[in-house]
Amino acid sequence: MDATYTMAQTPVQGQPSFAYYPTESQSRQQHFTSHPFEMQYYGQVSSYPQQQAQQQHSMPEQQPVYAAQPMLNMHQMATTNAFRGALSMTPIASPQPTHLKPTIIVQQDSPALMPLDTRFVSNDFYGFPSTPPLSTSGSTISSPPSSNGSLHTPINDCFFSFEKVEGVKEGCESDVHCELLANTDWSRSDSPPLTPVFIQPQSLTASQSSDLLSAQIPCPSLSPSPSPDSATFISHPQSILSAEPSGSDFCDPRQLTVESSVGAPAELPPLPTLSCNEEEPKVVLGSATVTLPVHEGLSPSFSSSSEDPLGSLPTFDSFSDLDSEDEFANKLVDFHPIGNTYFQGDKRQRLGTYLLDEDEFLSERSLEDLDDQEAFAQSGLPSVESTDFLAVEGDATQSTEEMSSKKRVTSRRSLKKASTSESSSDSLAKKTQASATSRSGHSDTTSTVQQSTASSRQNSTANTSNSESPAAPVSVNRRGRKQSLTDDPSKTFVCSLCSRRFRRQEHLKRHYRSLHTQDKPFECHECGKKFSRSDNLAQHARTHGGGSIVMGVIDTNSSNTQPAFDEPEPRALGLALYEAANAATSKSTTSESSDGTISDTSSVGGRPAKKRRRDDHV
């Protein structure tokens, strides 16, 4: 029989092999020519298997052979390898040549070795019938197409034939049926359901098993399976079990009775009620006033247990830990906003109703360092008018609280007033007197007021320094950010009204214009708004360049008209000092000053939108 199986010596290129029959007795069989891209592994279908079997012994050298080519795809290889073990092939040496390894030999005339073709290309090939199905099969999901019309083996668990569920659309019945099968109640199925049955142990006698089931025969729908454990009974409250032989330890599906789906609905399982001592019970199950009904008539007691399994279950009281405490929740969750909250970090973010003027926005561009800022640097704080200057000066505690409320407050140093020399006070008096004499109509009164005011300020300063009080309170109007509260002797320019010292004369002039007077020499050329400082005008000019709306600010001259002084000396003095100092640098003054003591320290140059030039003469 060695010649029966011929190894096809095919080259690696995979040329097709030919099987031919020279004798006339074999001419009735069709000639087969294999091709690499056709279904070669089925071989030639023989019409006369008996004649072929005789020819197999008579002329073994002419036996038609099926030779698979190396270029078979993976599907054909895997299908043929499944039947390789059933062949009685000729033993070959273990190290085979590389061109012979993929060659697979299958005997042609053995129909039992032919694999199933699930594709069913044509009727020329073998088509074995499918696996016999179960009793009833309503599903052919994931099954190959049938060639002979027989049902295929179902591969899912939804093979029961269900009745139509009311209120379900067509096409959705399978989802509903799967949900019904997932539950423990399979009474809707027409076939015997897989009822969970508790198998009694071997120690239980037949008389005991018949005694357990005797009370449950009349009502098979409400008869749970006997269980020695009460917890398992609660987990399966609707198990359906009918009478069975007393000597059996297993459930025979043929003797089970199935309740019709048209019958009365099953009752809820008897559960223990949750007893609460409060007037309004709060059940943990979610509702505030719902309690489950009490079922007095429970299922018949079992002889395997001494007492009712449900009666021995503990009762549940109300959980006080789960009740919501309003005080605890409100204190944690409710965050009421505080009404007096102010954001001092941003200059333009304000929540209070302040009287805002653009003069109050001070810019550090015109200062040499942070110590040169004046005491009345107002950034988002209430403005101080010139008429109520003494009222603000007398209110010490309120100003101190406003200073501490700023975001970038520095540590305060001790307030010490250094005694100024008489020469500096005399020179300041001479300067102010010369400025006052240059002003027409105010020469006599202004000079007299300046001398008296300066002398009184210097005398009070000298008395304070001589008494050696280390923390003598100065004017509480010092609200600038990060400034030195001790007077530096190098700051020669002293304000005669508030004793504020400056290194530059232009800072002193700006201090007078911003705080002590209401003169606004800088005017916006687009909207006509006037400002007392050039940097405020430059800041205002950006609003026109960006196309934003210019907000009107209340004129401070007309807002407060009640004088806080008995005599108008501070206003007249401030106007005289400003115009005298601005005479040499600005063309908008009313008189020309020829005094050489007040030099040209800064030049605005008639261009208020540009930066001021600084020339130190200290």
UniProtKB/Swiss-Prot annotation:
<dbReference type="GO" id="GO:0034605">
    <property type="term" value="P:cellular response to heat"/>
</dbReference>
<dbReference type="Pfam" id="PF00096">
    <property type="entry name" value="zf-C2H2"/>
</dbReference>
<feature type="compositionally biased region" description="Low complexity">
    <location>
        <begin position="417"/>
        <end position="432"/>
    </location>
</feature>
<feature type="region of interest" description="Disordered">
    <location>
        <begin position="582"/>
        <end position="618"/>
    </location>
</feature>
<dbReference type="GO" id="GO:0071277">
    <property type="term" value="P:cellular response to calcium ion"/>
</dbReference>
<feature type="zinc finger region" description="C2H2-type 2">
    <location>
        <begin position="522"/>
        <end position="544"/>
    </location>
</feature>
<keyword id="KW-0346">Stress response</keyword>
<dbReference type="GO" id="GO:1900409">
    <property type="term" value="P:positive regulation of cellular response to oxidative stress"/>
</dbReference>
<keyword id="KW-0843">Virulence</keyword>
<dbReference type="GO" id="GO:0000978">
    <property type="term" value="F:RNA polymerase II cis-regulatory region sequence-specific DNA binding"/>
</dbReference>
<keyword id="KW-0963">Cytoplasm</keyword>
<dbReference type="InterPro" id="IPR051059">
    <property type="entry name" value="VerF-like"/>
</dbReference>
<feature type="region of interest" description="Disordered">
    <location>
        <begin position="394"/>
        <end position="488"/>
    </location>
</feature>
<dbReference type="GO" id="GO:0042594">
    <property type="term" value="P:response to starvation"/>
</dbReference>
<feature type="compositionally biased region" description="Low complexity">
    <location>
        <begin position="582"/>
        <end position="597"/>
    </location>
</feature>
<keyword id="KW-0479">Metal-binding</keyword>
<dbReference type="GO" id="GO:0008270">
    <property type="term" value="F:zinc ion binding"/>
</dbReference>
<keyword id="KW-0677">Repeat</keyword>
<dbReference type="GO" id="GO:0034599">
    <property type="term" value="P:cellular response to oxidative stress"/>
</dbReference>
<feature type="compositionally biased region" description="Low complexity">
    <location>
        <begin position="443"/>
        <end position="458"/>
    </location>
</feature>
<feature type="compositionally biased region" description="Basic residues">
    <location>
        <begin position="406"/>
        <end position="416"/>
    </location>
</feature>
<dbReference type="InterPro" id="IPR013087">
    <property type="entry name" value="Znf_C2H2_type"/>
</dbReference>
<keyword id="KW-0863">Zinc-finger</keyword>
<protein>
    <recommendedName>
        <fullName>C2H2 finger domain transcription factor sebA</fullName>
    </recommendedName>
</protein>
<keyword id="KW-0804">Transcription</keyword>
<feature type="compositionally biased region" description="Polar residues">
    <location>
        <begin position="459"/>
        <end position="469"/>
    </location>
</feature>
<dbReference type="GO" id="GO:0005634">
    <property type="term" value="C:nucleus"/>
</dbReference>
<dbReference type="InterPro" id="IPR036236">
    <property type="entry name" value="Znf_C2H2_sf"/>
</dbReference>
<comment type="function">
    <text>Transcription factor that is involved in the response to heat shock, oxidative stress, and poor nutrient conditions. Controls expression of oxidative stress response genes such as ccp1, cat1, cat2, sod2; as well as of heat shock genes such as hsf1, hsp30 and hsp90. Negatively controls the expression of the fumiquinazoline (fmq) cluster via binding to the STRE motifs at the fmqA-D promoters. Plays a role in virulence.</text>
</comment>
<dbReference type="GO" id="GO:0000981">
    <property type="term" value="F:DNA-binding transcription factor activity, RNA polymerase II-specific"/>
</dbReference>
<feature type="zinc finger region" description="C2H2-type 1">
    <location>
        <begin position="493"/>
        <end position="516"/>
    </location>
</feature>
<keyword id="KW-0805">Transcription regulation</keyword>
<dbReference type="GO" id="GO:0000987">
    <property type="term" value="F:cis-regulatory region sequence-specific DNA binding"/>
</dbReference>
<keyword id="KW-0539">Nucleus</keyword>
<keyword id="KW-0862">Zinc</keyword>
<dbReference type="GO" id="GO:0005829">
    <property type="term" value="C:cytosol"/>
</dbReference>
<feature type="compositionally biased region" description="Basic residues">
    <location>
        <begin position="608"/>
        <end position="618"/>
    </location>
</feature>
